[in-house]
Amino acid sequence: MIIDAIEAAFTRAKKQGWEKTYWLFDLHDTVITSNYGVGEVEEYFPFALETLKILSDREDIVLILFTSSHDEKIKVYMEKFKNLGINFNYINENPEATNSSYANFDVKFYFNVLFDDKAGFHPMKDWEPVYQYLIEYYGK
């Protein structure tokens, strides 16, 4: 479950003394419904925006948009998120994690938590528990 990944990320960060964790978010069928190019109507899944807002407000969490959308659509999405008070730090990259003696991030960039329907995230089931966990974890 996604909560296990979140708890593992927080635990690892605390143990290692890391100041940040890196969270990837696919867009279609994860944050918003897919319309497969038919029309412009896309809907946010319940609790997605509320959860993203909590995460966006945290200095210890880096949000990365992980999408195969075309650049012009990404600009539209980023503007929409910005207007909602949700700020993704990066798009399809994590320049903060650099190569080291034990890891090469030239092709696969570093992240701690992945929200993607292709990776088992179920937006209709998983957003609310994540939201509730963060409310409890952060005391909001």
Which role does the model predict for each range below?
Residues 1-140:
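HAD-like aspartate-dependent phosphatase fold
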